[in-house]
Amino acid sequence: MPFLFFAVEITMYFCRICNDMNLTVDVGNTLYKFAIFNGNTLVETQGCEKQQVLQHIKKLFVSYPEITHCIVSSVVSLPSQAITLLEDFSSVHVLSYISKLPFTSTYKTPETLGTDRIALVAAAAMKFPKKDVLVIDGGSAITYDFLSADNQYIGGSIAPGIAMRYKSLHSFTAKLPLLEKTAAIAMIGNSTETAIHSGVIQGITLEIDGVIHQY
């Protein structure tokens, strides 16, 4: 589970000198995800949609008033109200490319590097020291990021996620229907719908296998 991998390792890094209650917040394109830690021990994970975030944060700190430190990773513009509310209850660090990170980088445009990718590479650097690591994360987009054994972030690639692939087939053609992912996928589709499912899911599977093989 990418979020938990990020949350555990990034909390261990940024909050390693304190044994208090810590909070990580992962702000995605559709959901807010929260992980509460007692020191480095995961206590609970929670989640909510964007429109519920202010109410959710208030309830979270009612349940865990001991939280003293918070780190936020956001791939979208974070509402100032949410940051202000978090700061009312804890010391907040918003992750960015200028944060003190456990790796060096050769990325040519670090200011454009998503904090979701930064967080996962930071987690990989801590979890797998002195090893070449390929980090794959699937969400709205599928990202591939490479960390070398000498702890240097080289870069990676960004590809459309599952929902984006379904939507693009529908949006850029005249007659293909808009579908949602399904659990049962045949390699060879015997109808337009099953052919779309096969193209999207098998395409992603083969893409991931190919990227792993390439690296």
Task: Label every model-predicted segment.
Residues 48, 52, 112-119, 164, ...:
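Conserved active-site and cofactor/substrate-binding residues in soluble primary-metabolism enzymes
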Residues 1-9:
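Hydrophobic alpha-helical signal peptides and transmembrane signal-/tail-anchor segments
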Residues 46, 185-215:
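Adenine-nucleotide phosphate-binding core of ATP-dependent small-molecule kinases
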Residues 90-124:
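Glycine/small-residue-rich loop that forms an oxyanion/phosphate-binding "nest" at active or ligand-binding sites
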Residues 11-101:
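N-terminal glycine/serine-rich phosphate-binding loop of ATP-dependent small-molecule kinases
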Residues 21-38, 131-153, 169:
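Gly/Thr-rich phosphate-binding beta-strand-loop-beta motif of the actin/hexokinase/Hsp70
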Residues 115, 120-130, 154-198:
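Glycine-rich phosphate-binding loop plus the immediately following alpha-helix
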